[in-house]
């Protein structure tokens, strides 16, 4: 597993503007019916990562205007709650995601946006302006690297108990991490997170 220094990894130097996959209308990548965009490229290389195929920034296909139109059309369905970004590392693909999130906020402001990241919230607060801008425009962040030694299959939307589901807007307003108020881990899982 790699641990970056603040502002060491820059999207403009790493991202190739590519994605691994786009999956519309799923129920596993966050709350409600969601569309999921898997971006290419990750520098964290977590041991036991279930998505090793996304590590290369050259993997997959180019992100295109046509794909963006499809994402917007799929997101416009009234039963779709929002869009989820996974990878790969979304925050190393700000060149793709910043224009997309700004368009969503303008055209479909009622939709929510979830993102997974290997960065912790505390690391993100020390990151580059593009990453902080992207963070400021999303609703939910699942933070932290996957840690195989803390694996827990009972966790909601996470693989290891060091990862948190963070309400981004409440956290930014309060200046401290605010956990998503719909967190529904089992009692045993909660006690494990609390101990750490």
Indicate residue ranges for each PLM-predicted region.
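P-loop/Walker A phosphate-binding loop and immediately adjacent motor/lid segment at beta-alpha junctions
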Residues: 93-108, 151-196
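Short secondary-structure boundary segments
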Residues: 117-118, 144-146
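N-terminal [4Fe-4S]-dependent radical SAM core
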Residues: 1-38, 51-57, 177, 184-193
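Flexible, glycine-rich phosphate/dinucleotide-binding loops
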Residues: 28, 122, 150, 174
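Conserved Radical SAM active-site core
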Residues: 14-20, 33, 51-115, 119-134
């Amino acid at each position: 597993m790699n641990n970056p220094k603040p502002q060491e990894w820059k999207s403009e130097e790493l991202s190739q503007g590519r994605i691994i996959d786009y999956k519309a209308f799923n129920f596993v990548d966050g709350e409600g019916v969601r569309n999921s965009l898997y971006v290419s490229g990750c520098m964290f290389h977590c041991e036991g990562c279930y998505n090793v195929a996304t590590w290369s920034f050259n993997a997959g296909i180019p992100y295109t205007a046509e794909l963006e139109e499809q994402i917007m059309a799929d997101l416009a369905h009234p039963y779709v709650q929002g869009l989820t970004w996974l990878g790969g590392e979304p925050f190393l693909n700000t060149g793709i995601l910043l224009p997309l999130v700004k368009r969503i906020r303008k055209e479909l402001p009622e939709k929510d946006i979830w993102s997974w990241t290997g960065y912790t919230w505390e690391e993100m607060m020390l990151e580059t302006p593009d990453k902080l801008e992207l963070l400021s425009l999303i609703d939910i962040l699942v933070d932290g690297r996957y840690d195989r030694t803390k694996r827990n299959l009972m966790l909601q939307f996470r693989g290891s108990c060091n990862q948190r589901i963070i309400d981004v807007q409440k956290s930014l307003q309060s200046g401290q991490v605010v956990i998503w108020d719909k967190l529904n881990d089992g009692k045993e899982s909660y006690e494990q997170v609390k101990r750490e």
